[in-house]
Amino acid sequence: MPKLKIFLFKYLYSKRFIGILVAIAIIFSYFTYYTISIGTKNGAVNSSKVIWFLLIDLIIFLVLGILLTRKFFQSFFFKNSDQNTSKLQNRIVVAFSLAAAIPTIIVSISSAYFLNLSIQAWFDRKISVVLDQSIMVADSYIAEHKVLLRETALAVAEDLSDMYYDLIHNPALFTKTLNTEAEMRSLDEAIVLNKSTNTIIANSYLSFSLSFATIPAHLIKKADSCEPVEVKSDPTKIRMLIKLKEYNDVYLLVGRSIDNKIIDHIDATNGAAAEYHRLKNQIGNIQIKFSIIFIFIALLLLLIAISFGVIVTAKIVNPIKKLVIATDKVKSGDLTVQVPENEVDKDEIGTLYAAFNRMIKQLSRQQRDLVIAQRALAWSDVAKKVAHEIKNPLTPILLASERLLKKFSPEIKERAEFENYLKMIIRHTNDIKNIVSEFVLFARLPAPKFTNCDLIYVINNIVEARKLLNNNILYSFETNIDQFDFTCDTTQINQVMINLLKNAEESLEGSNQAAIKVNINTSEQFINITVLDNGRGFPPELIGKATESYVTTRSKGMGVGLAIVKRIVEEHCGVLDIANRETGGAVIDIRFNLEELKLKVKRHEIGVIS
C-alpha cells in the first residue's frame, strides 16, 4: 500500500498526467461549447446535458488548478527552509499568471463589450422597423390582390346570375361566356362547380380540374352566403369561391397567379423576419454562451500560464536552490561541496555552476595554503627560538668533547671505550646541529638570486658527485638536449637536487639492486626534471602530505626537506608532484613554467633596479 500511494502521488504530480488532464479539459470545453451552440441554433438547449458538461469541466479545471497551484500556495502560505528560492518561485509563477490573466481579462471585457455593441447593432430598432415594413408591404400586396379578386368574383357571379336562363341549359355557351369573363377580367382560372353532382359545369381554357373534395367543407358553407371566400389550396395563387344566386348548389371559383419572384421575395422576407425575431428573443442565450466561452478561455489560458510558470520556475529555481544549499554548506565551513554541472544546460546557469565550482576549489586551495603558511610561520618562530636555545649549549659541549678526546685520550687506560663515548657525544651533537640547521634554513629561506646557468651542466655535476659518494647505487642521467640556458638561483637548485637524491638514497638502504634515474625533458613552455628510484616509495597515506612541514617517516630529521624543496620550486614558478611507481619506488617530477619564470625574473629585475 505505501508503494502504491507513492506511485499514485508521483503520477498525479507528473508532467505527463497534467498534460493529459489539460488535453481532457480542452476536449470537454469544446463539447460544452458545441452542445450550447447547437442547442441555441435549433432553439432547444438540452439543459441537462449542458449542466453535466459544465460540471465535468468544472471538476477537471478544479483538479488541474489544485495540481498546478499546490506547490505555489504551499510555498506561499507555509514558509520552509527554501524561503529565498520559494519567494523567487512565487514571483515567477505570479508573473506568468498575471501575464496571462491581465491580457485575457482585458480581451474578455473588450470582447464582451464589443459583442454587446454588435448585438445591439444587429437588433437595432431601425432594422426591426425595416423588416416589419417589408412584411407589411408584402402583406399589402397580397391583400390588394385579394380585394381586387373579390370584386372580380362578385362581378363575374352577378353576370352569370343575370344570364342564368341562357346558360343553364347550354353548356357550350356557359363555357364560352366564362372564358370571355376570364379574358376580360384577367383571370388565370375560372371554374363553375356543381356541389350536388360534384362535377364541373364550365371552366376557362387555362383552368385545371378541381373538385369539391379539395375545398374544405367550412369554406363551402361560408360561401353559401353569396359572399366571396378565399380558398388557400395553392400558395402560388389567390382563389375566391362564391355561390351563384340563381343556381342550385352551383359555385364559382376564380383565381389569379402570383409572380414567383414576388412569392420568393415574400417567403425570404418572412423567413428573415422570423429568424431575426427568433435570434432577438435569444440574445440572452447568445450572451451567456459567449460569456461561458470567454470564461473557459480565460481559465484555460490562466492554467496554461501557471503550468508554464511552474515548469519554467522548476527549470530556473531548482539549479539556484542547489546553489543556495551549496552556499549554505560553504558558509558552515564545508569547502569540499560541488554542484553537478552535468545536470544543467550549457547556458548562463551552467556558466554560474562552473564558476561556483572553480571558486570553491580556489577557496579550498587558498585555505589549505593559508593553513600551511600559518603552520610554517608558527614553526619558523619555533625554529628560531629552538635554534637559538640549542646552539648556545651545543658549541661548548662539542668543543669540550673534542678537547677531552685530544688531551686525555693518551692517559686513559681504557682508551678505546673512552674514545667511543666521546665520539658518540660528538656524533649526536652533530646530529642535533644538523637538525637545528634545518630549522634555521627552513625559517630563513632567502629569496632566490636569479642568474643564468646551464641547467644540464649543473644537474649532471650533482649526479656525478652523488655517484662518487654512493658507488653501490646505479646512477643514470638522461636528457633530450645537451645544453639548456636556465635563469635560477643555482644554490637553491643544487639544494633541491641534493635533497631529492639524498631522500632517494635513503629509501634504497638495504636494496641489492639500488638504482636512481634522473631525466630532463623540455617542451615549448615547460622543462621537466624527474627523479626515479626503485626503493620503498612513500606510504600511501603520506603522499598527499609529503611536502608539508615536519612530516617524515625517518627517525632522524624533522621532515622539512621536501617542504623546502617545494618552496624553492614554487619560487621558480614550478610545480612539484610526488607519486609511487607501479613497479616499486618513488617518482618525483618538477615542472618549471618557463614563460611565468621569465616574467617573474623581469619583475624581480625591475624591483631591484628601482
Curated annotation (Swiss-Prot):
Entry keyword Transferase: yes
Q: What is its EC number?
A: 2.7.13.3
> For the Histidine kinase domain, which residue ranges apply?
385-596
Checking SMART domains in the record gives: HAMP (SM00304), HATPase_c (SM00387), HisKA (SM00388)
Q: Which Pfam families match?
A: HAMP (PF00672), HATPase_c (PF02518), HisKA (PF00512), NtrY_N (PF19312)
Reaction(s) this enzyme catalyzes, per UniProt: ATP + protein L-histidine = ADP + protein N-phospho-L-histidine
Q: List residues, modification Phosphohistidine.
A: H388
Q: Does the keyword Nucleotide-binding apply?
A: yes
The membrane-topology field of this record reads:
Multi-pass membrane protein
**Domain HAMP: where?**
314-368
Q: Name one GO molecular function term.
A: ATP binding
- Transmembrane feature ranges: 18-38, 49-69, 92-112, 292-312
Coiled-coil region list: none
Tell where it localizes. Answer: Cell membrane
InterPro entries (alphabetical): 2C_sensor_his_kinase (IPR050980), HAMP_dom (IPR003660), HATPase_C_sf (IPR036890), His_kinase_dom (IPR005467), HisK_dim/P_dom (IPR003661), HisK_dim/P_sf (IPR036097), NtrY-like_N (IPR045671), Sig_transdc_His_kin-like_C (IPR004358)
Q: Which UniProt keyword terms apply here?
A: ATP-binding, Cell membrane, Kinase, Membrane, Nucleotide-binding, Phosphoprotein, Transferase, Transmembrane, Transmembrane helix, Two-component regulatory system
Q: What Gene Ontology cellular-component terms does the record carry?
A: plasma membrane
Q: Please describe what this protein does.
A: Member of the two-component regulatory system RBE_0470/RBE_0312.
Could you tell me what this protein is called?
Answer: Putative sensor histidine kinase NtrY-like
